[in-house]
């Protein structure tokens, strides 16, 4: 069983300072659609600010019970996997309750580091509940990465340019780990 947590704090800003980023509607919609397509159990939007969580809840509410459900039922269905939470600890707690065991925590980063887990290695070991942790802004702060069990290798295309949006990275990660393909 796979979970995704989209963490908004603590993350880096473009200057390398620790910050809190804002929740965006694009991230919510696109990551929910990818999560539902690939059978992710839950997508957690993790944000410490009550006001930012209210924004996310309002967006979700429009699609769950508001006019959005009738206007675009597929979008409404995709968003059903999404939960808003104040901390990564609460997301982990919820996933643990659902599965009966703490998920393997997998940090993501765009930086290559020694000891990272490859997509192939992780794909072969998805027999335990697993939580992929995505960072917004310019990536997860060390305090989040350090508490994870594994760090996933970066996504690289054929060029040296490596600056994907978090929602594009999330979709690629879902496909590489859960997609139907012959290996």
Placement of each model-derived feature along the sequence:
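Long, charge-patterned amphipathic alpha-helical coiled-coil/hairpin "stalk" segments used as oligomerization
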Residues: 107-144, 154
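RNA substrate-binding interface of SAM-dependent RNA methyltransferases
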Residues: 1-110, 171-182
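Secondary-structure boundary/capping motif
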Residues: 52-55, 114-115, 140, 161-162
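Short secondary-structure transition/capping segments
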Residues: 55-59, 119, 164-165
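Generic hydrophobic-segment detector
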Residues: 25, 85, 125-129, 159
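Short, well-ordered alpha-helix to beta-strand connector turns
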Residues: 40, 102, 128, 148-149
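Structured adenosyl-cofactor binding patch, chiefly the S-adenosyl-L-methionine
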Residues: 138-183
């Amino acid at each position: 069983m796979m979970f995704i947590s989209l963490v908004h704090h603590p993350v880096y800003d473009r200057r390398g300072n620790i910050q809190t980023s804002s929740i965006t509607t694009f991230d919510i919609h696109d990551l929910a659609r990818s999560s539902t397509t690939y059978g992710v159990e839950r997508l957690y939007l993790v944000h410490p600010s009550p006001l930012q969580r209210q924004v996310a809840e309002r967006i979700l509410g429009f699609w769950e019970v508001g006019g959005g459900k009738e206007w675009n039922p597929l979008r409404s269905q995709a968003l059903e996997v999404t939960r808003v939470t104040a901390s990564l600890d609460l997301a982990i707690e919820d996933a643990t309750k659902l599965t009966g065991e703490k998920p393997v925590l997998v940090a993501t980063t765009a930086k290559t580091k020694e000891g990272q887990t490859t997509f192939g290695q992780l794909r072969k070991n998805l027999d335990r509940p697993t939580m992929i942790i995505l960072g917004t802004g310019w990536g997860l702060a060390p305090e989040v990465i350090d508490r994870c069990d594994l760090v996933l290798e970066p996504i690289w295309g054929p060029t040296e340019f490596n600056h994907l949006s978090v929602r594009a990275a999330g979709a690629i990660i879902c496909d590489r780990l859960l997609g139907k393909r012959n290996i």
